Amino acid sequence: MAIVKATFDATWGDVVSEIRGAMLRLKQAQKSSKGAAAYSRYVNRPLGRPLAATAFAWGMTPSQVTVVSALCTLTGVALIALLAPTIWSSVLVAALRVLGYALDSADGQLARLTGTGSLAGEWLDHFFDSLKLATIHLAVLVCWFRYYDLDDLWLL
């Protein structure tokens, strides 16, 4: 199967065909589920697979997917601090974070599919994972400070 990678002369059918082919190859390129968290096994990986296949068809690298993942997740984190907590802001934040974590799974799947995994890519992935973990707590603290009437001692 020829790699289409969403060139301007590719038809929608060509791109869809490339995505389907990548989905089939991704099923064989999955890492073991042994020891994986349930959320990763049943949410991140299944959502990440079509995202990885689409990124493959578009010609993206795993590191590019990592950056898009970080942008989605960190935008969600920033919105926690910036928006008043409402049902709609919560839905938006949740959607961005789920998309970000699905893309975080997709970058590794894309690397396995293309055989382009690298130490630099792994470092980039771990860097953004650490940044996401650290900033979520800060965002919640800022949200509580801005939107809730709490004694300052509770915020320490």
Residues of each region from the PLM?
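Topogenic membrane-insertion module of multi-pass membrane proteins
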Residues: 1-92
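Generic preference for hydrophobic/aromatic residues in regular secondary structure cores
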Residues: 23-27, 103, 145
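Sequence-level detector for tyrosine residue identity
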Residues: 39-42, 101, 147-148
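Short helix-loop-helix connector
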Residues: 55, 115, 144-145
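Residue-level signal for alpha-helical context at structural boundaries
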Residues: 69, 128-129, 145, 149
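Helix-coil boundary and interhelical linker segments in multi-pass alpha-helical membrane proteins
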Residues: 77-92, 138-156
